[in-house]
Amino acid sequence: MRLCDTDIERYLDQGIISLTPRPSNEKINGATIDVRLGNSFRVFREHTAPFIDLSGPKEEVTAQLDAVMSDEIIIGENEAFFLHPGELALATTLEAVKLPANIIGWLDGRSSLARLGLMVHVTAHRIDPGWEGKIVLEFFNSGKLPLALRPNMVIGALSFEVLSGTAARPYTSRKDAKYKHQQSAVASRISEDK
């Protein structure tokens, strides 16, 4: 069952769910809590690679990804990151999220931003039970104009559901968890898939 606003507030007060820094209670609405944009970004570099072979040997996939992904880009508090039409970028939420092993979270974009063509997550909007870290956003501008994104702007909303039981393999206890405790816009680690 999805948590309502009063349950989200209570779970935050009791430390069952943690968002750091904690948003004010005014940011809790109905069944969601607003999250803001952090200052860490990554983009695809200009490149001439014809493709990335995602099923190739791990070393080759890693080398191909390293060749096309930028280093981390840190934007100052009063600066803007410009996402141009047709571009994909990675970013993070300002808030770090910590969930227990019996709660799953969901990230949704804002309708007001979607109406401008901004997709906040391309496909990955699940926050696994036992997650600890910032949420990486997969931005895509499907609109016609560049969009100026600034740290601290409300970028999405989280909702939470209590599972039917406690997960036996929560994210932080998994040895194969590729993005455990992430604090920045971590590039794809698909080459670590088993």
From Swiss-Prot:
Query: Which superkingdom heads the taxonomic lineage of this protein's source?
Result: Bacteria
Q: Which gene encodes it?
A: dcd
Q: Name one GO biological process term.
A: dUMP biosynthetic process
User: Does the record bear Signal in its keywords?
Assistant: no
In the record, the note on similarity to other proteins reads:
Belongs to the dCTP deaminase family.
Q: What is this protein called?
A: dCTP deaminase
Query: What is this protein's function per UniProt?
Result: Catalyzes the deamination of dCTP to dUTP.
Q: Which UniProt keywords apply?
A: Hydrolase, Nucleotide metabolism, Nucleotide-binding
Q: Which CDD domains match?
A: trimeric_dUTPase
The subunit field of the Swiss-Prot or TrEMBL record says: Homotrimer.
Q: Active-site positions, per UniProt?
A: E138 (proton donor/acceptor)
The UniProt entry, under InterPro entries, shows: dCTP_deaminase, dUTPase-like_sf, dUTPase_trimeric
What species does this protein belong to? Answer: Histophilus somni (strain 2336) (Haemophilus somnus)
**Any GO molecular function:** dCTP deaminase activity
Q: What class of enzyme is it?
A: hydrolase
SUPFAM superfamilies cross-referenced by the UniProt entry: dUTPase-like
Give me the reactions it catalyses: dCTP + H2O + H(+) = dUTP + NH4(+)
Q: Where does dCTP bind?
A: R110, S111, S112, L113, A114, R115, D128, V136, L137, E138, Y171, K178, Q182
Pathway linked to the protein: Pyrimidine metabolism; dUMP biosynthesis; dUMP from dCTP (dUTP route): step 1/2
